[in-house]
A protein has these predicted regions:
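Structural helix-boundary/capping segments
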Residues: 150-152, 200, 217-233, 397-423
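Active-site metal-coordination/substrate-binding segment of hydrolases
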Residues: 84-150, 397, 403-404, 408
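Midchain, well-structured core segments that form catalytic/ion-binding scaffolds
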Residues: 170-318
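An extended, acidic, His-containing surface patch that forms the Zn2+-binding/catalytic region
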Residues: 63, 238-269, 323-423
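Short, small-residue-biased leader/transition segments that mark boundaries at the very start
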Residues: 1-7
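Active-site beta-strand termini and strand-to-loop segments that position acidic
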Residues: 76-80, 203, 375-378
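Acidic/histidine-rich catalytic neighborhood of metal-dependent amide-processing enzymes
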Residues: 124-198, 257, 264-265
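N-terminal helical capping/dimerization or prosegment-like subdomains
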Residues: 18-97, 290-294, 308-309, 403-407
Length: 423
């Protein structure tokens, strides 16, 4: 690797130049190397092995924490002592779909017109590699005078966050003061995000011939009653859901390029519940003996997972607990921190010097690995989601990250990590 290049257009002062270890070409090549590794909801262990070898070249120790034979996390540290800043990105990517739909091969990094094309460039191998390079350059320049940076590269974020949950269960977050998730954020700094739950309600009746329906119990009718009552419960909640700990309006207004009204703001910042799937019956001349309804619920601190579980059980008791059950296959908590916590303060102060625009501060309507890392953040860990890339490019055909944004965020991260730990 090159270690003697300091690009003048990226360097802000002499200290920055001293912290630059890798050339721009090297930084792009490193991203290309991990884009090449096809981690479509599997095989993250190959990225772990690549990063472990890379970090070892710069005397940075790391550990592979296996989920199974093909899926794993990587943990690496530089510095020592408190405070501990955890930095995290996931190694899995979503399916690339039909490769013929892509202008360029999805698992070969293509550098064209100032854009780096490839699956995962934005979501989120670009952010992950920017963090890794920032660690390397801080280590090589001996710029870190206080505290510890702990890299947590995770598996399975796009599915059930089991990589992050494993690291949390094994104590890798127990001593952290701050956490940065490097998801693509379009130059928005997120101080909090919503949670997400999947709930499946099943109605079980009794089959009978449609000519003799009185001999059966119609599961569809029972489930329709449940859905209608839950709809009324949700309406009642939204009528009172007027004060929000999470303010997602700045994010939405930036993306939509317009102001939004009060009704919209209640949706974006508040509790959201959607009945997205309804299935019942097998054939037209039979009384259906089974029906299912699936809900996606976006939770907030005021209406968390415990509230949702209690709500579903309450409606089931009222409609018919002899016929209805609820299963919750996935549940990720909302995560909140102070809007002006030290990480957010450093990001909003430092990043504009590199990205040449003010940083909007907002809550995020999606979820991240922080749900598994921090839960509801009862320990009040300083928290930020901030990373290179436009969030609208995530999961898209011809996914790309702007080259200048990827390179700039390496410098942003170096300065933010250092400033946070020193103060």
């Amino acid at each position: 690797w090159s270690s003697d290049v300091c690009s003048s257009d990226l360097t802000k002062n002499e200290e920055d130049c001293e912290m630059t270890v890798l050339s721009e070409q090297d930084k792009i090549r490193l991203l290309a190397d991990i884009v090449k590794i096809q981690t479509e909801n599997n095989h993250e262990i190959e990225v772990c092995e690549y990063l472990k070898d890379l970090l070892s070249q710069y005397d940075i120790d790391s550990k592979i924490v296996k989920v199974n034979d093909s899926r794993a996390n990587l943990v690496a540290e530089i510095g020592s002592g408190a405070p501990v800043l955890a930095i995290s990105g996931h190694m899995d990517v979503v399916d690339a779909g039909d490769h013929d739909d892509w202008t360029f091969p999805p698992f070969e990094l293509t550098d064209k017109d100032g854009k780096l094309f490839g699956r995962g460039t934005t979501d989120m191998k670009g952010g992950l590699m920017a963090m890794v390079i920032a660690m390397i350059e801080l280590k090589q320049s001996n710029a870190l005078k206080q505290g510890t940076i702990r890299l947590l590269a995770t598996s399975g974020e796009e599915t059930e966050q089991y990589g992050a949950q494993l690291l949390a269960d094994e104590g890798y977050l127990d001593d952290v003061s701050g956490l940065i998730i490097g998801e693509p954020t379009s130059n928005i700094a997120y101080y909090a995000h919503k949670g997400s739950m999947s709930c499946v309600v099943t109605a079980k009746g009794k089959a009978a011939h449609s000519s003799m329906p009185h001999l059966g119990t119609n599961a569809v009718d029972i489930l329709v009653d449940f859905v209608n009552e839950m709809k009324q419960e949700y309406k009642n909640i939204k009528e009172h859901d007027k004060v929000h700990e999470l303010d997602a309006v700045p994010m939405i207004e930036k993306h939509l390029h317009r102001k939004i009204g009060e009704e919209e703001s209640h949706i974006y910042s508040g509790f959201v519940m959607l009945n997205s799937v309804f299935n019942g019956g097998k054939q037209v001349n039979s009384v259906p003996h089974k029906a299912t309804a699936k809900y996606n619920v976006r939770t907030v601190p005021e209406y968390d997972s415990t509230f949702v579980k209690d709500l579903f059980e309450k409606v089931i008791r009222h409609v018919g607990e002899d016929y209805l059950t609820v299963d919750i296959p996935s549940s990720h908590d909302p995560v909140a921190s102070d809007r002006d916590n030290p990480l957010i303060q450093n990001i909003t102060r430092i990043a504009p010097n590199y990205v040449h625009e003010d940083i909007v501060v907002s809550a995020l309507i999606g979820t991240t690995d922080a749900s598994s890392f921090l839960g509801t953040n009862e320990n009040n860990v300083d928290f930020a989601v901030f990373g290179p890339g436009e969030s609208i490019m995530a999961h898209q055909v011809d996914e790309f990250i702007r080259k200048d944004m990827y390179l700039s965020y390496i410098d942003v991260y170096k300065d933010v990590f250092k400033a946070y730990l020193e103060k």
